[in-house]
Amino acid sequence: MATVTVNTLEFVSALRALIPISKQATLYSGEKERNAATIAARITPAKKLALITGNSALGAIASVGIEQAVEAGEREFCLYTDDAKNITSIFKPNKQNSEEPLRLEFGNQLDNENIMIAETHKAYGNTELIVGNLAEDAEITDTLLNDLYLSVNNPEAPESPSFNVIKVAAFTTASKIYGEAATRVTGSDAGRIRHLIYGTHLHGVIALDRGMEDSEVATLVSEARNTVLETMGNRA
């Protein structure tokens, strides 16, 4: 699995360089490299394209790479973004040319944009959405997730699509994260969840739980940066 840390100007080059070469590429922007490095360190490697973006510009850049991957037959995407509005435009009905679900995993904290995403994809047919989140108030989070589920699984809606929302995690305190996660993964959804997806603010929780110091987190970031620079240099 290639772990890539790049700044905004390098992001397009990294996408174009890695997407055709490997189906196991994790790409994320330098804007949130501390967050992304620690998240990447915990994600189970999987054959999917993962993107972490931090603003509209990066979202637009990432959408270009995703659209190319969809056209190439990719069906699974793990999206980490604080501004996902640009992502939604590229999953168009004419891209739904397979009976296999298009799996979309959103790793940011659930908000109104995510609900908008769900409403947008509701019209796109055979789609599966996995929402992962870290919330201070689990009750509020559950309400949002339930509303989201109902909005995309309304049996009375005309031509209701196959659109499943899997609630991955809603935690009252950060200290419960791994116990709760383990319970959920070994539960009824275990066969459907490839790996856990959490929010962009999770890096502090991971660092605390793993006993990592800031210097260790910085080392992860440095190693990731060196990896992509070396990789891109070898493939230039």
Say what each PLM segment does.
Residues 1-236:
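DNA polymerase processivity clamps
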